[in-house]
């Protein structure tokens, strides 16, 4: 428990060793939206706990991207810093459990941090992938500078576009993609019905959903029946 990025919050390694029994500790941190998280510090701490040494050029780009992901000029109440925080932490726990390779660790954290970077305001339903394509356009100069080459960028682009919620990805051999797609979904449902409704309330406000939050959450669960979780640890994380 040496690496603590929030007061009284244990390290990723500690949580991973006890997962899913340690889920209640993560719930308290994930569900709290009182304090704005330091996404740069959080990302560095998660990488450190994953035994990844972050060199200066990468640190610099990560800091700039963390700052951009902390911007919330449309006052999003769901796709905000707290959603990024949740995806980063849970993805890091899964990466630790699955013993991800070194270069995959920074790739995963980068995707977890930035996958909804330009998801500002209401989704434009008439234009599929609108927010995702905006995110990729903004990300490209940062990511190419220190993180990836063209081949890896194609992989990065594919994974990020597959986070588009209506898209159904039946199978993939990409371990980073499996983690990100699963975590992006289960962080809204793995902490039980009551917490699912709390998160639905935040999303309801953001997308100006006219019906009640129960209807929104039911609709979310209904859509999930068409999708599937790719990892056994994801399924165990959602078990009561």
Which residues does each PLM region occupy?
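Short alpha-helical scaffolding segments that buttress acidic/His motifs in well-ordered protein cores
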Residues: 61-69, 108-115, 156-164, 179-184
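Histidine- and acidic-residue-rich, metal-dependent catalytic cores
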Residues: 76, 84, 91, 107-108, ...
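Divalent metal-dependent phosphate-bond-processing catalytic cores, especially two-metal-ion Mg2+/Mn2+ enzymes
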Residues: 2-44, 77-85, 89-102, 114, ...
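Conserved P-loop NTPase mechanochemical-coupling segment
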Residues: 70-73, 78
């Amino acid at each position: 428990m040496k690496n603590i990025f929030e007061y009284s919050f244990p390290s990723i390694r500690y949580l991973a060793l006890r997962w899913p029994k340690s889920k209640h500790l993560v719930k308290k941190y994930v569900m709290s939206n009182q304090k704005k998280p330091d996404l740069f510090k959080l990302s560095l701490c998660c990488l450190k706990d994953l035994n990844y040494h972050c060199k200066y050029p990468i640190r610099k780009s990560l800091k700039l991207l963390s700052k951009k992901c902390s911007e919330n000029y449309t006052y999003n109440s769901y796709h905000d810093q707290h959603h990024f925080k949740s995806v980063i932490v849970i993805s890091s726990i899964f990466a630790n459990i699955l013993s991800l390779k070194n270069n995959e660790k920074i790739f995963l954290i980068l995707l977890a941090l930035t996958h909804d970077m330009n998801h500002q305001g209401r989704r434009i339903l008439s234009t599929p992938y609108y927010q995702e394509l905006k995110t990729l356009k903004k990300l490209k100069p940062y990511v190419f500078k220190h993180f990836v080459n063209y081949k890896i960028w194609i992989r990065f682009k594919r994974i990020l576009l597959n986070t588009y919620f209506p898209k159904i990805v039946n199978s993939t051999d990409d371990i980073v993609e499996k983690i990100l797609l699963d975590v992006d979904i289960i962080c809204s449902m793995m902490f039980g019905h009551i917490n699912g409704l709390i998160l639905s309330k935040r999303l309801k406000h953001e997308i100006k959903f006219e019906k009640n939050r129960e209807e929104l959450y039911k609709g979310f669960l209904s859509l999930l029946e068409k999708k599937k979780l790719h990892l056994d640890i994801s399924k165990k994380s959602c078990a009561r």
